[in-house]
Structure formats: C-alpha cells, structure tokens
C-alpha cells in the first residue's frame, strides 16, 4: 500500500528539516539533510496522496514512497555517524 501522505505542511522542506533536526547535532550533515528534504518534497509533489498524480511515472511507486519515509527516519543517524567517522579519521593523520 501507499504510505500516509504527510500533508501539504508535512512535505515542506523546512518542516522536514526541523523534524529531522538538520544540522542541530552536526552541521556537516545539514547539506545532506537539506538535499534529502527537498527531494522528499519534490517526490510528494509529483506523486501526491496515492501516487495517482504521477501516472506512468516510475518514481511514483509505493516501494519508493515507503523507502523515502523510512529514510527520513534513519538518514540523519547514518549521516552523523559517517561525519563523526570522517572527522575521527582525518584527525589521525
């Protein structure tokens, strides 16, 4: 099935960034976070509440929609971990 539509306010990039805490823990993750939120917004604008507005578009499928919403939950954790690892590694040289 198609995941719940976050609502016209919920798909806004600024709302997404706030919800994910973009850059709050780690400024280096801000760029990745912003890019993700913009992509997510475009996805929802294109695909709508149930993918119907993107007829024939391969991007509007439930698997991708679920992946987008799942990614928003895991993205920042992963980014922060990666950044921390890079900083740690860079400091060793």
From Swiss-Prot:
Coiled coil: none annotated. One of its GO terms (molecular function) is toxin activity. GO terms for cellular component: extracellular region. It comes from the Eukaryota. One of its GO terms (biological process) is killing of cells of another organism. Localized within the skin and proboscis and are most readily isolated from body mucus secretions. It is found in: Secreted. Keywords: Cytolysis, Disulfide bond, Hemolysis, Secreted, Toxin. Disulfide bonds join 16-37, 22-33. Belongs to the worm cytolysin family. Cytolysin that shows hemolytic activity (on bovine erythrocytes, HC(50)=5.75 mg/ml). This hemolytic activity is completely inhibited by small unilamelar vesicles composed of PC/PG, PC/PI and PC/PS in 1:1 molar ratios (with at least 100 mg/ml concentration). This is Parbolysin P2.
